[in-house]
């Protein structure tokens, strides 16, 4: 059975996915993985354990196979159909069998999330899955029966934190008398280091990749029933978006929320591990996105951030099966025409162009109309996917924030080519200039990597000059960390010494904060619409909120401001801007997005 499933996985499944047999294909893949778990990864204390793990994990279809087969134009539909029909006669193994909602029996789950906003969103999905199976999400680590580490693999330091935490958990099990504590590693690190995690002496009980969270209750059931001591599911799905799962929101104040609109990435930048840990791009059904936004609006949320690894390459092209006529969504959607997703002029891709579909610009238009009083942000985009019509939409829709993340990574065309970013310094600057012309005062943020393979002093200086030219409002700056499996790991040489990487990173950080402080000084006297989202972490004497441009503003919680409430919009005058991080503001009046837009109309004191 295993050999037959193995052959199917490696030769036929991905072609079937292309021929609209996704559900059948995924069931067969899942059978392969789950039989791999239940039959071949039972953990015994014998000397053959590590070899057994290696032998079985190497049979898992690789991402290269995934990509290669997904671009295959040969139609093998008839040949594959008979094979799949034969395999359909087999019943699903217990690993994927549906569980009753009370299977968790109230056992307490503690989740620690590391890394990006997508991981935060994934945690909310995991919470929903666990609660629906009868588990309780715990707010107290000390009472938890199960601990999940929701991990990041983007840099070596991110993984080092997890190894340290696993060491701590191993000690807690031993020294605090909690030998039955179940420890699971979820997310990108689980996908990337599945073999190492299972072979280590950290006593990891469960390893689950980003596309396999639905199987968590089943995996736990096999552990709790004593069927095996370790369970793994690290399948990369061609269509999993968790669209039907209602996230359990983790926000305490119910002001802002994340909405995941797509998963995976096709860009294959030479330094990046994301395509190997999260798979290929797939867009979530548009109706489900708009319903979630409407639900958040009904709950009183005031700000939504649309999420994706490459969010503005959203391209939904499947027909909707939803025949519900009671909502605004279907009526609007049916008016949309499918469009080709093409990179901006001066930018290029290394992958095959997708089918015509509903693009990110059209999605943003629909989302912005669900509730004109909800702010809309999005992250993380790619510079190639900023067409002019998207910029015009942002300009004309008051509730789409005038704050764009435009990851540069480097200011050197030579380094950008080595990174396989698909653009030059000149084309990036052209995009920035266009944004500044179409959206005056728009805040721009970015990502930068210092010390990439082959980076010279001149390359580094070009990055510094780009930062000085643009004047970023926020930046995520890191030293290059070589990741296995990436193009850089296979083809390039990590030849910049660590000390030089550090010194260059220091200069990058210093340049950013110098320009930011200059820009903050220019804010004094400007009026912004600030959404108050809580109190300052340093002192409850100050409210804290954010402008449309995502600048943090402190407002004194004094006698004059007793009417200020969390979750409301206020017009605020900036009175102090000497901090590198926050501004100080004085509230003028309570307002709304539409009211503020009518008063200022993006002119006068508003940036």
From Swiss-Prot:
The gene is cdk5rap1. Probable regulator of CDK5 activity. This is CDK5RAP1-like protein. Residues 251-518 form the Radical SAM core domain. [4Fe-4S] cluster 1 binds at residues 116, 152, 188. The keyword Iron-sulfur applies. GO terms for molecular function: 4 iron, 4 sulfur cluster binding; metal ion binding; N6-isopentenyladenosine methylthiotransferase activity. It comes from Dictyostelium discoideum (Social amoeba). It holds the Pfam family Radical_SAM. [4Fe-4S] cluster 2 binds at residues 265, 269, 272.
């Amino acid at each position: 059975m295993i050999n037959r499933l193995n052959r199917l996985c490696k030769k036929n499944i991905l072609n079937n996915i292309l021929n609209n047999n996704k559900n059948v294909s995924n069931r067969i893949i899942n059978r392969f993985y789950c039989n791999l778990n239940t039959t071949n990864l039972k953990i015994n204390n014998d000397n053959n354990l590590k070899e057994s793990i290696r032998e079985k994990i190497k049979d898992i279809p690789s991402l290269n196979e995934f990509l290669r087969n997904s671009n295959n134009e040969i139609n093998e539909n008839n040949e594959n159909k008979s094979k799949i029909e034969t395999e359909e006669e087999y019943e699903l193994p217990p690993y994927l069998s549906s569980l009753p909602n009370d299977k968790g029996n109230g056992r307490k789950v503690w989740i620690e999330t590391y890394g990006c906003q997508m991981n935060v969103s994934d945690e909310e999905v995991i919470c929903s899955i666990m609660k629906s199976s009868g588990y309780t999400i715990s707010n107290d680590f000390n009472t938890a029966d199960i601990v999940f580490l929701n991990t990041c693999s983007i840099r070596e330091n991110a993984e080092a934190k997890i190894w340290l935490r696993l060491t701590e958990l191993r000690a807690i099990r031993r020294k605090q008398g909690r030998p039955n504590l179940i420890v699971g590693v979820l997310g990108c690190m689980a996908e990337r280091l599945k073999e190492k995690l299972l072979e280590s002496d950290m006593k990891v009980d469960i390893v689950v990749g980003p596309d396999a969270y639905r199987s968590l209750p089943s995996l736990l059931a096999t552990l709790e029933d004593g069927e095996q001591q370790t369970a793994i599911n690290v399948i990369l799905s061609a269509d999993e978006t968790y669209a039907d799962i209602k996230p359990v929101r983790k926000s305490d104040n119910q002001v802002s929320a994340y909405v995941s609109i797509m998963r995976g990435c096709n860009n294959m930048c030479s330094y990046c591990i994301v395509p190997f840990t999260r798979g290929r791009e797939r867009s979530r059904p548009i109706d489900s996105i708009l319903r979630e936004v409407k639900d958040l609006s009904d709950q009183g949320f005031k700000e939504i951030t649309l999420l994706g690894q490459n969010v503005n390459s959203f391209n939904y092209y499947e027909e909707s099966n939803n025949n519900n006529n009671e909502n605004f969504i279907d009526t609007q959607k049916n008016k949309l025409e499918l469009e080709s997703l093409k990179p901006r002029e001066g930018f290029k891709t290394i992958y095959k162009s997708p089918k015509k579909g509903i693009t990110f610009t059209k999605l943003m238009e629909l989302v912005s109309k669900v509730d004109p009083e909800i702010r809309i942000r999005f992250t993380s985009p790619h510079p190639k996917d900023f067409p002019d019509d998207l910029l015009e939409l942002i300009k004309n829709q008051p509730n789409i924030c005038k704050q764009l993340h435009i990851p540069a990574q480097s200011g050197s065309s030579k380094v950008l080519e080595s990174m396989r970013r698909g653009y030059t310094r000149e084309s990036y600057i052209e995009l920035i200039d266009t944004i500044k012309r179409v959206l005056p005062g728009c805040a721009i943020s970015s990502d930068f990597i210092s010390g990439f393979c082959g980076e010279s002093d001149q390359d580094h200086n070009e990055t510094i000059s780009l930062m000085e030219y643009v004047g970023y409002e926020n930046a995520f700056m890191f030293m290059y960390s070589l990741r296995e499996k990436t193009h850089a790991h296979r083809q390039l040489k990590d030849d910049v010494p660590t000390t030089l990487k550090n010194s260059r990173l220091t200069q990058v950080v210093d340049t950013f904060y110098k320009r930011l402080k200059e820009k903050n000084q220019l804010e004094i006297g400007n009026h912004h619409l600030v959404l108050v989202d809580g109190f300052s972490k340093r002192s409850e004497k100050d409210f804290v909120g954010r402008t449309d441009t995502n600048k943090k503003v402190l407002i004194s919680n004094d006698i004059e401001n007793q009417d200020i409430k969390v979750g409301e919009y206020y017009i605020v005058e900036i009175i102090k801007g000497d901090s590198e991080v926050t501004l100080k503001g004085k509230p003028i009046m309570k307002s709304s997005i539409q009211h503020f837009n009518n008063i200022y109309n993006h002119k006068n004191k508003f940036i």
